Amino acid sequence: SLTKAERTIIGSMWTKISSQADTIGTETLERLFASYPQAKTYFPHFDLNPGSAQLRAHGSKVLAAVGEAVKSIDNVSAALAKLSELHAYVLRVDPVNFKFLSHCLLVTLASHFPADLTAEAHAAWDKFLTIVSGVLTEKYR
């Protein structure tokens, strides 16, 4: 679980991130599809060209879910339960993709907030996103 210091870091950075959530979400997905093209197979009905309306809409949803997890940092499992079920039972997303997405989000945060993403903040976000990924894959077990 996260320490009080880690929660503080995530909460304070989230206030900055949330004002740019759509851009960051879109960039994160663009980075995911460029780095891990196999992830595109889950979006056969999407226009996956950079900046497409569908990519922007889904990027916005991804960051909204991260925001829900930040808001419910003490109970991420409850906050993301429906999303976990959707990805496990309906969409059947390979769990490794959540690790890939987390990595791409960290890289995107580093590019937008270089001064804020210190080693300590990077470690806190990595730990937090590992918790989020764990919740999103817990229904697979």
From Swiss-Prot:
GO BP of this protein: cellular oxidant detoxification; hydrogen peroxide catabolic process
Keywords noted in UniProt: Acetylation, Heme, Iron, Metal-binding, Oxygen transport, Phosphoprotein, Transport
Modification Phosphothreonine, positions: T28
CDD domains attached to this UniProt entry: Hb-alpha-like
Function comment: The zeta chain is an alpha-type chain of mammalian embryonic hemoglobin.
Alphabetized PANTHER family for the sequence: HEMOGLOBIN FAMILY MEMBER, HEMOGLOBIN SUBUNIT ZETA
Protein name per Swiss-Prot or TrEMBL: Hemoglobin subunit zeta
Taxonomic source organism: Sus scrofa (Pig)
